[in-house]
UniProtKB/Swiss-Prot annotation:
Belongs to the DsbD family. It comes from the Eukaryota. GO terms for cellular component: chloroplast membrane. This is Putative cytochrome c-type biogenesis protein DbsD-like. One of its GO terms (biological process) is cytochrome complex assembly. The lineage of its organism: Eukaryota, Rhodophyta, Bangiophyceae, Bangiales, Bangiaceae. PANTHER family: CYTOCHROME C-TYPE BIOGENESIS CCDA-LIKE CHLOROPLASTIC PROTEIN, CYTOCHROME C-TYPE BIOGENESIS PROTEIN HI_1454-RELATED. Pfam families: DsbD_TM. InterPro entries: Cyt_c_assmbl_TM_dom (IPR003834), Cytochrome_c-biogenesis_DsbD (IPR051790).
């Protein structure tokens, strides 16, 4: 079985178990939601973007001191989690056809990832005086948070099946507070590889390069 087909089938299997857990809430439901987020993150979609996230958090030179790296990681993850929660609230309030709501996100994802890559290469910058002043005055914190928001929007399209299941459950049960806690836990599990990768940035970047090569190989073969 090809890797991409295995990942697809596995995600749908986890999605079915998640739906069962949501309909039969117990003490293990919260931990399973975290594990479902973690499992969903182990896909080519997330692995391919990990190096960009790690470079933003740990710095291009990998020489940030532990305090600054921890601060960057916190702000980046805060931005990512807040984007997930915001998307969940908007999708629940605006529409019940969640697939239509997420249709435009892949395009937004591509734009965000391309911009962040070009920004890391110092090719593209935002030349707004107000934006630059805001970033400078807050010692880079706002830019790090905003980067997390952008990545959160970008990777949300990779988590559609289980994320939509959570949104449908929230809408059908009207347990909004519990649902938001589930989205919070799910998003933490979903970005857990980014957290681990940032802590062990040097070793993790080498690992993701190897994994990206293995994952991209079947796609290259299809071109011939």
């Amino acid at each position: 079985m090809k890797l991409d087909l295995f990942v697809y089938n596995s995600q749908h299997f986890v999605n079915n178990i998640t739906l069962y857990q949501l309909n039969h809430l117990n003490s293990t439901s919260f931990s399973f939601i975290f594990l479902s987020g973690l499992f969903t993150s182990l896909s080519p979609c997330i692995i391919s973007i990990l190096p960009v996230c790690i470079l933003y958090i740990a710095g291009e030179t990998q020489k940030l001191n532990p305090i600054n790296k921890t601060k960057n990681l916190f702000l980046f993850c805060l931005g990512t989690i807040s984007s997930f929660i915001t998307l969940g609230i908007l999708a629940t309030l605006i529409t019940k056809t969640y697939s239509q709501f997420f249709n435009g996100i892949p395009t937004i994802s591509a734009v965000v990832i391309i911009y962040m890559g070009l920004n890391l290469l110092n090719i593209v910058h935002i030349n707004s005086p107000k934006f630059n002043g805001l970033v400078t005055n807050n010692n880079y914190n706002f830019k790090m948070y905003l980067s997390g928001v952008g990545i959160g929007i970008a990777i949300s399209s990779c988590s559609t099946p289980i994320f939509v299941t959570l949104l449908v459950w929230i809408n059908s049960t009207q347990k909004i507070f519990t649902g938001l806690i589930f989205i919070l836990i799910y998003s933490i599990g979903y970005i857990f590889p980014i957290i681990i990768g940032s802590i062990f940035s040097t070793s993790f970047l080498k690992l993701t390069e190897s994994l990206s090569g293995i994952i991209m190989a079947p796609s290259v073969e299809l071109c011939y």
